[in-house]
């Protein structure tokens, strides 16, 4: 049966009346186990104690207990606010679950213990950290501690620290300054896992080693396992290796899906809008022009002498191409087409009626009538108008010169046209 250290062999700092500060179920005689093999009190048998005989760790210091008694516990309202704040912080900053593995007999067997990594310092590497577990003085590591004595061992050292009496960041910083590669902080009188946070910003910036928090039962088992096997060591591992897949991060997965969906919806909206505008543009170009704006001049073939062109003052001959405007005036196609192309507006040369469109190279455009007023400054009548006026004046003069000739203006015009078109006689005949 395992032997426990008698009370008179305990250090003075450990002689605390446990029954006075603990419930009746915890009032047991405290014992002290060797931290490493070979450091047992004289006269002890070389037997490894069981976990049932492990001493309960000493609770918080008397100073903190006195402060609690003096200041009192927080009020229920403040406690509720504190609980809500802790819940919010836990949602915003959830640490990754890690594992403390006790490796026995040259990696032949191992025991895992659950823990929580600290929210400060460097995170655990995927391959983990190996080292021999050691206890130091003071056990709470609130003051500078002793450096580890490894001798010829190939692995580093991992320190086991008791909770309370100071902040977590100070404990881990003292372990780092002593030369330990990692720190394990265990709970006291509880098996709950606590997320370790920092208090002092300047201390947090100096911490460069990882640290984890374990329960009280895990610390007791680690003492027994690692204290009874010389080749046993501790291995701090992250529970899950780092995952770069979106399936490991639900929030990122949902955000990615929502982002892709929104991008597809916006793209589809722009594409449909562009197609709709393109379809409207095509329909507008294919709409038929109104009947009132697409009146075209009629083209006919002249078959008999019945009139003359008001532009060139030549009679129509058989086979000439004539163009009849909407106002029923007829012109040569070779005369009216250049007229339309050079005139500032498309209108009949005689009656000035607007022509919406023609059949040969003209658009159905109606021009303004502001230039039709001859009284406007800068107005110059066209050549054909001057020729018409001169021709009318000549006919009038011919009619006055022959008072005994009872001929109409039409007959005089025809006679004048015949005379003017006859070839001149040669002299001397």
From Swiss-Prot:
ZnF (RING-type) ranges: 309-352
Top-level taxon of origin: Eukaryota
Signal peptide per UniProt: 1-27
Pathway given in the UniProt record: Protein modification; protein ubiquitination
Domain PA: 151-223
UniProt effect for mutating residue 152 to S: Abolishes glycosylation
Biased composition (Basic residues): 37-49
Gene Ontology cellular-component annotations: cytoplasm; endoplasmic reticulum; endoplasmic reticulum membrane
Reported impact of residue 107 to S: Abolishes glycosylation
Entry's localization field: Endoplasmic reticulum membrane
Swiss-Prot/TrEMBL keywords: Endoplasmic reticulum, Glycoprotein, Membrane, Metal-binding, Signal, Transferase, Transmembrane, Transmembrane helix, Zinc, Zinc-finger
Chain spans, region Disordered: 30-67
Sequence ranges on the Cytoplasmic membrane side: 272-429
Role played: E3 ubiquitin-protein ligase that acts as a negative regulator of NOD2 signaling by mediating ubiquitination and degradation of RIPK2. Also catalyzes ubiquitination and proteasomal degradation of CANX within the endoplasmic reticulum. Could have a role in spermatogenesis.
Quaternary organization: Interacts with CANX.
Protein name: E3 ubiquitin-protein ligase ZNRF4
Record organism: Homo sapiens
Gene encoding the protein: ZNRF4
């Amino acid at each position: 049966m395992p032997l426990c250290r008698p009370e008179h062999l305990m250090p003075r700092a450990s002689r605390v009346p446990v029954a006075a500060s603990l419930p009746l179920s915890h009032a047991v005689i405290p014992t002290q186990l060797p931290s490493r093999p070979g450091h047992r009190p004289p006269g002890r048998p070389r037997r490894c104690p069981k976990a049932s005989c492990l001493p309960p760790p000493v609770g918080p210091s008397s100073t903190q207990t006195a402060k609690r008694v003096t200041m009192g516990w927080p009020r229920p309202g403040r406690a509720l606010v504190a609980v809500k704040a802790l819940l919010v912080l836990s949602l915003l900053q959830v640490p990754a679950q890690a594992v403390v593995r006790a490796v026995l007999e040259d990696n032949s067997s191992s025991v895992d213990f659950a823990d929580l990594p600290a929210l400060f310092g460097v995170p655990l590497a995927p391959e983990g950290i190996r080292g021999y577990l050691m206890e130091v003085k003071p056990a709470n590591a609130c003051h500078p501690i002793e450096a580890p004595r490894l001798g010829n061992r190939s692995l580093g050292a991992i320190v086991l620290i008791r909770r309370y009496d100071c902040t977590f960041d100070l404990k881990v910083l003292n372990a780092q300054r002593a030369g330990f590669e990692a720190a394990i902080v265990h709970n006291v009188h509880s098996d709950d896992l606590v997320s370790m946070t920092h208090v002092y910003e300047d201390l947090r910036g100096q911490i460069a080693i990882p640290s984890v928090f374990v329960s009280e039962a895990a610390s007791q088992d680690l003492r027994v396992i690692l204290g009874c096997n010389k080749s046993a060591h501790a291995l701090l591992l992250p529970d899950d290796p780092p995952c770069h897949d979106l399936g490991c991060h639900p929030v990122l997965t949902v955000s990615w899906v929502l982002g892709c969906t929104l991008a597809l919806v916006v793209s589809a909206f722009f594409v449909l809008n562009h197609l709709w505008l393109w379809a409207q543009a095509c329909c507008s170009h294919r709409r038929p022009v109104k009947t009132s704006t697409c009146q075209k001049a009629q083209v006919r073939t002249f078959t008999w002498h019945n009139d003359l062109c008001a532009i060139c003052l030549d009679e129509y001959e058989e086979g000439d191409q004539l163009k009849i405007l909407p106002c029923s005036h007829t012109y040569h196609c070779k005369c009216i087409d250049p007229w339309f192309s050079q005139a500032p507006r498309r209108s009949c040369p005689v009656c000035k009626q607007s022509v919406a469109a023609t059949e040969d190279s003209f658009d159905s455009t109606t021009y303004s009538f502001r230039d039709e007023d001859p009284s406007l400054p800068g107005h110059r009548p066209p050549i054909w108008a001057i020729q018409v006026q001169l021709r009318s004046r000549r006919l009038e003069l011919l009619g006055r010169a022959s008072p005994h000739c009872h001929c109409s203006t039409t007959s005089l015009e025809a006679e004048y046209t015949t005379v003017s078109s006859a070839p001149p006689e040669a002299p001397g005949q």
